[in-house]
């Protein structure tokens, strides 16, 4: 194995009940997909804007807050600096709330934006889009074959099929 990669779908934002952790609505939650073109969307009665999108980030604790900075290492998280504005129809009501939202990783905890005492804006776990392994296959005939194996795209070498089953 030379290199393994996981490509992920863009982050999804949703609103949950802070006390139960259940999405709202529970059976079929509303989501906002934050792809590279996303600037603004609506979730329930909240206008959501992304002020900053850091695909690979780590938290930095300052004297009074936690902010995120670019960090291209293992355990990095996708961090979104979001603004959530309560709305009544097309009219803004109240003050916008601003904060970082992440889904967390094995290294860093998730970060939510508290909207009310009962509601929080959260990022769902990132879903894998593609797994790929760049491999070297050494044959009995002294060949070194370099290939990329993906799920449902096996590599055939000397009558053998090499599969990528998952990560």
Predicted regions located by residue number:
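Solvent-exposed, non-transmembrane regions of integral membrane proteins
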Residues: 1-167
